[in-house]
Amino acid sequence: MTPIVFIDRDGTLIEEPPDFQIDAYEKLRLVNGVIPALLKLRDAGYHFVIVTNQDGLGSPTYPQASFDGPNALMLQIFSSQGIVFRDVLIDRSWPADNAPTRKPGIGLMVAYLQDRDIDWARSAMVGDRPTDLQFAENLNIRGFQLRTPQFGGDWDWDGIAHTLADAPRRAVVQRHTKETNIRVEIDLDGAPQARITTGLPFFDHMLEQIAKHAGISLHISAVGDLHIDEHHTIEDTGLALGQAVRQALGDKRGIGRYGFDPPQLPWQVSGAAAHGGFTLPMDETQASAVLDFSGRPYFVFEGTFVRERVGDMPTELVPHFFRSLCDASGMNLHLSVHGDNDHHKVEACFKALARALRQALQRHGHVLPSTKGAL
């Protein structure tokens, strides 16, 4: 799905003159900061649509020819800098006409409201007047009013681009079945913290390792049919957590994508190069994790456990949890562990995954890390 920034023209893309008509080339001036802001938003995956009221356009007081020349030059300037508008929607009515197509009315938006490929949750409206904010409210999207001497406002283009392109990656998932009721709240850019309650204290402790060592904020509340056994609770928690990660990542622009973290220290942990992933020791145990947010879920596990359970967590459900996480998140994960102490082995698996996640989730600009154009 594609997010769209709907943009007013006069006073937002170009400076508005005292007579409120840009009908001559000498009146054409770009608003400060608009080009770098739109480039940043473009690189973050946004499309652009101009929505503008042009009072009486085509009438004797505002001839079409007087509008066309400066408007074409404006579009050419933006195009020369790599900024292309998906559409230019113009209402030509007078304010007294109360036309439904005139902002803040949304009559010009019928085709867009029927488009199922628009990401409305991330879309926004940018303008310089209160009517632009009302237009945004009517569309149920976020509105930004540029700061101008004529109409006030609180925003500049740099702040708008930062807010939209660098928005925190958050998600809330509620998974409710006849067997479990699970709520996951995740913030991939939040301060590392965990609040976990699943009814399985050892499992809670393992999930806390993900939040701590991946550097994310994670809240999980799970109520399951533990009177039967632990399977449904652990499996569905993995599915809900994976769904939340996938949702928070959005279109994955700018992420590292891969989690492998090759050794960068002056010494090398034994076996790290051979495993090719993030490798960590825990006493006699060593675990390695390498992952890819490819959108193609796959899980490979190498390791064995001697004990039937560690604490209240069956060891057979350790790889099953990771498989569920991969299935729901679209992640490819290769995880291996060897050692003597099963507690250490389970905990090392969760910590190795978390450290690989930390690298894969990091932002590096806004470029999509794929030649296919989608992940």
UniProtKB/Swiss-Prot annotation:
It catalyses: D-erythro-1-(imidazol-4-yl)glycerol 3-phosphate = 3-(imidazol-4-yl)-2-oxopropyl phosphate + H2O; L-histidinol phosphate + H2O = L-histidinol + phosphate. Keywords: Amino-acid biosynthesis, Cytoplasm, Histidine biosynthesis, Hydrolase, Lyase, Magnesium, Metal-binding, Multifunctional enzyme. GO terms for molecular function: histidinol-phosphatase activity; imidazoleglycerol-phosphate dehydratase activity; metal ion binding. CDD domains: HAD_HisB-N (cd07503), IGPD (cd07914). Signal peptide: none annotated. In the N-terminal section; belongs to the histidinol-phosphatase family. This is Histidine biosynthesis bifunctional protein HisB. Residues 169-375 are annotated as: Imidazoleglycerol-phosphate dehydratase. It is found in: Cytoplasm. Pathway: Amino-acid biosynthesis; L-histidine biosynthesis; L-histidine from 5-phospho-alpha-D-ribose 1-diphosphate: step 6/9; Amino-acid biosynthesis; L-histidine biosynthesis; L-histidine from 5-phospho-alpha-D-ribose 1-diphosphate: step 8/9. InterPro entries: HAD-like_sf (IPR036412), HAD-SF_hydro_IIIA (IPR006549), HAD_sf (IPR023214), His_synth_bifunc_HisB (IPR020566), HisB_N (IPR005954), Histidinol-phos (IPR006543), IGPD_sf (IPR038494), ImidazoleglycerolP_deHydtase (IPR000807). Residues 1-168 are annotated as: Histidinol-phosphatase.
